[in-house]
Amino acid sequence: MPAAQEGPAPTGADRPYHVRALRDAEAEVWVATSDDVPGLVAEAATIEELLDDLRSIIPDLLQLNAVPHTDRIEVNFIAERIEAIEPAA
């Protein structure tokens, strides 16, 4: 019989890492941060570029910070953008 795991399963094994991206309208970039991935701060001009960057940054940061994870890293990517809408006159 296999030994029982102690403690909760690492993030990524039973739940995704949460990453939030916010649009910085003044700087014209998307900025990603995460409480689940220590040290994660990334920016890019488009969401697509940001996602491409995160695919390499997240595994590197998890390894550098000795964060336990499975071979498959799942990410819940949440993007937010504030848009000002002027009513028609």
Feature map (PLM): residue ranges:
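A short, exposed loop/beta-hairpin motif centered on an aromatic-Gly-Thr core
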Residues: 38-49
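Short aromatic-glycine-(Arg/Gly/Cys) micro-motifs in beta-strand/loop hairpins
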Residues: 22-37
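Short, charged, surface-exposed hinge/linker loops at domain edges
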Residues: 1-22, 48-89
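A general structural-boundary detector
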Residues: 8, 37-38
